[in-house]
Amino acid sequence: MSGKAALSNAYFADLQTALAKAGLCEPVLLIDKTRLNQNIDTLKKLLPRGMAYRIVAKSLPSEKLLIHVAKRARTDRLMSFNAAMVAQLLARLPHYDQLLGKPVPVAALATLLAGLKPSQKKALAQVQWLIDTPQRAQQYGELAKAQKLTLRLNLEIDVGLHRGGMAPGEGLQATLDEISKTPQLALSGLMGYEPHLTKLPKLAGWPRRAKSATREIYTAAVAQTTQTMGARAVKNMVRNMAGSPTFRLYQDTQLANEMAAGSTLVKPSDFDMPLLKPFVPAAFIATPAL
């Protein structure tokens, strides 16, 4: 099936025929591989030069699907969201780099570590744990000392969404100081989650001001991190910001050098927005008519 084909009656008739040939007679989620590939290629073409792509694993929750997207997009970066997901990906895709999209409580991390095989513990070097407070950084440091391992930490910067994370200032400084004095902790990057930029009402310049404020906050966080950790450390670290709804707002890698997306590759109706117009729907729910 052509990825550029319109969603016509003929298209859905072809899907129906394919499902019947496959012997699928119960409700299923169907991915049009041709359309998926078209979206992957579109994403890569739209990324600024030097912008790395990280696959959001929860949006494409299938090992085969993740591997396919990773190969076609030429990336080994995944975003996971809880300890159970980390464990599954460590077991099945141990060579992929994982970045947590949400902080994991230290108790959950301890439970995860207790259940890992020795080979999987080695793969922990591929995981970046999201840290949102100085207290969590301290807890991770204590656990790392007790377990005699090194944990990579990516710091969540509150750029205006106010879901958590640290603003530039005392909290961020305390976290950076904790990492600096703890050999078992390593700074791997900064994350600035900003999906609110495309959801604000277009009144009185709100989107423009929010975008400007986001850039100012994140720039200040990078500057503070550079002052504490050194320019070399910051140059090589992950600066993750954009997601499916917002990555087209970035024209270069001056601020962010990595974006994370998953849903835009299959484009459910929630992602039918102007910035994602170049992408086509690639996921469909099929159910027999009784």
Model-based region annotation:
Residues 11-29:
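Generic N-terminal amphipathic, Lys/Arg-enriched alpha-helix
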Residues 249, 279-286:
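Short coil-to-beta-strand transition motifs
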Residues 12-16, 35-64:
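N-terminal glycine-rich anion-binding loops that anchor highly charged ligand groups
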Residues 53-199:
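Active-site-proximal beta-alpha core segment in soluble small-molecule metabolic enzymes
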Residues 1-12:
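N-terminal basic/disordered segments at the start of proteins
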Residues 152, 158-277:
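Active-site loop/helix belt of alpha/beta enzymes
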Residues 36, 40, 109, 133, ...:
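Aromatic/hydrophobic pocket-lining residues that form the small-molecule binding cavity
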